[in-house]
Amino acid sequence: MWATGAIVCSPVFRILSTCCPIRRGVPTSNGYHPRPKHVDIGNGAVPILSSKPITVQPTNSDYYEPVNNGTLPLSSSGALIKQYGNIHFRVEYDFEQSKLSVTIVSASDLPAMDRNGMSDPYVKVYVLPERKQKFETRIIRNTLNPTYNETFQFSIPFNELHSKTLMLVVYDYDRLSKDDKMGQLSVPLESIDFGITTDIERPLQKPEKDDEKECRLGDICFSTRYRPATGTVTLTIMEARNLKKMDVGGSSDPYVKIYLHHGRKLLSKKKTSRKYKTLNPYYNESFQFKIEPHMIEKVHLIVSVWDYDKMSKNDFIGEVTLGSKHLNLPQITHACSEQWAEMMTSRRPVVQWHTLQERMEKEKKKDDD
């Protein structure tokens, strides 16, 4: 049985100020664009698009654009600093297991995305055109020269490698809004000699803007709070934005379902109310899950968004999985594991936006409403 009702969120002001920021800035046909702060570096004013703390919700055009006055400066090693930075990675292929290994070694000379002149970079790694397997490095805070040394494996038959392209996209992590792309690199695998381990360092290119090609599903904002004394986790679904259009009229009737899992075992499930004809629903509905202290690091929560259909089965839009990084579940992003970790150390609600993801192929199933 679905649990019904919603518990009023508290404290309300703190959460609303995060998920529902006051829009201040320049009005445009698409809404409001923030007024970026400027830093004078002697050759002109460079806009610094900061989102910590956030006062507006960023648009797709709000990317950091480094200024090049025609003379690229030198790094400490004497190498030219590229305007989007550089990335160092390693590629090798295991012919016996048909596995492609990609090691993200480091990045350097990345653009500064935060007010303090630093960034919180991480790298997404995937292979085109399928995008079935996506990996992320850990987030390294307050640096423009992160070192990762993290390896990811893709199952690809050797005779298919020539038709694949390796994509590396560097992001700046932001807890209170959508993460910003800093730079990207596409590597056609047909150009790689897989007879040896290939060590590559290349400049990053200008990142592509989010568009229909990226099949964005939308974003969701929720808060989490853990009370060890009572063994309860309170999850408050605040709102969602820019959801995928599921209905003929170009809208959706979204609602949110929350599943509590221990491994593959379903322990509890709850859902929000439905919101009709909107791609930006507001909920502010809270749910409590009873979790014993010895189980808190063994369970995970799946927050999924669905489109309600009266005449047919409901359609899945997207989901995020929240849990400890020690579970080693590939669907738990670094943003989700960081929110979980902060929830475990803070006694206040932890609020964060997340980008909705596709379900992994083996986990796809129909709605059971």
Curated annotation (Swiss-Prot):
- Quick one: which residues bind Ca(2+) 1? 114, 120, 172, 174
> What Gene Ontology terms describe where this protein resides (cellular component)?
axon; dense core granule; exocytic vesicle; plasma membrane; synaptic vesicle membrane
Residues given in the record as Ca(2+) 4 binding sites: 247, 253, 307, 309
Cofactor(s) demanded: Ca(2+)
Q: What happens when the gene is disrupted?
A: Defecation abnormalities.
Q: Which Pfam families match?
A: C2
Binding site residues for Ca(2+) 3: 174, 177-178, 180
Q: Which Gene3D superfamilies match?
A: C2 domain
Chain sites annotated for binding Ca(2+) 5: 247, 307, 309, 315
CDD domains named among the record's database cross-references: C2B_Synaptotagmin-1 (cd08402)
Instruction: Write out the similarity annotation.
Output: Belongs to the synaptotagmin family.
- What protein name is recorded for this chain? Synaptotagmin 2
Organism equals Caenorhabditis elegans
The beginning of the lineage is: Eukaryota, Metazoa, Ecdysozoa, Nematoda, Chromadorea
